[in-house]
Structures are given as structure tokens and as C-alpha cells.
Amino acid sequence: MLKSAFWGGIASGIMVGIGGTVYLSCENKVVGATLFSVALLVICLLGFYLYTGKIGLFIEKPDKLSAFALPVGLAGNAIGAGLTGFGAALVKPALVETAKKMCDAKLEGGMLKGLVAAVFCGILMYAAVKTYGTKGTLVGIIFCIPTFILCGFEHSVADVYYFTVASLAKFDPMSIVFILVAVAGNTLGGWLLPVLTGLAKGKEQGNGAK
């Protein structure tokens, strides 16, 4: 499972990086955000490992092996997204300045804003993956991904890609802190809906037993 999480994590990071590339390349942000969905579509359909999709499912059925797989998969995600960032900057040098402006705005917004934005992204990522896993529909992916992008919510793996591209203009050490904050926010957001769902079901069962 750890091997699968690592290599599948790299594959997911690459796909997220490709999604980030098309988003940065589009002048029309609605079009770019919609096309970004190709990343999660491929990840879900091919069964790759994406931390932001797995963390919410983990809290539903936690186990030791999955707990070890999460950081391994996240490392793979970061490697894949980072390598894609370097490759995209080589193929499309104009993206560097675009990414730098975006990342400068992220850092200027502060860590608290980044954390809250990442929580909202985590909620939408869980919703997208859960609806695909339980209902077999891609509707959640097609709508949730553009929604978090157009809202300006923070996806930690996508941020690895954006900050990697931006670093080719100028590296800011605070970008690493920002990404870690985004990971924390995505984790909290990914846990929120399953925890609330569990509490709701527990309440219903308690009422039914009376």
C-alpha cells in the first residue's frame, strides 16, 4: 500500500500540476478552472493517490496502514507537482511571472486567510471524491473543482505547483510555511463533513432507540 501511495501520489501530483498549468495559461479564469477538473477526473478514474481526496475518507475508517500511507502519498504528490512545475516553466516561461503574482498575493493575504481557504477547499475535495466513490457520478468533481478554484480556496498540492513555478523568478522561504498551513487546512476541511455526518447519524440512531 505504501508503494502504491507513493507512486500513485507522484502521478496525482503530475495531474494536479497539469491542471495548474492550464489554469495559469487561460485568460478566462472560468474556462481555466473548469479545465483544471481534468486533474481529479483522471486521478479518480485511474485510481491514483491524492492526499486531499484520501484524508476525508481516512477519518471515516481509520487504520494504521492508511495512516502511514497518507504522508507517503503526500510526499509523492509534492514531488509530482514540483517536477511538473519545473517542466511547465521550461515549456511555457511566461507562466513564471503569472505564478509569481498569484503566489505573492497568497503570501500577502496571510497564513490565517490561507488556513481558512484551505479548510473550504478540503470540504469540497471530500464532497467531490465521496460522491464519486459512493454514487459513481463525476458531477461532484466537475462542479466542486471549479468552485474551489474560482472562490480562491487553497489546495495544498496545487500550491506546491504554483510556488515551484513562482520560485524560478524568486524563491520565498515563507512559501513552504504557507504550503504546510494549506495541508493543515485541507486536512481539517476533509474531516469536517464526515465528522458532522457521523454525529448526525449517531443522533438519529439515538433518537430511534428511544
What does each of the following model-derived ranges do?
Residues 1-210:
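Alpha-helical transmembrane segments and their helix-helix packing motifs
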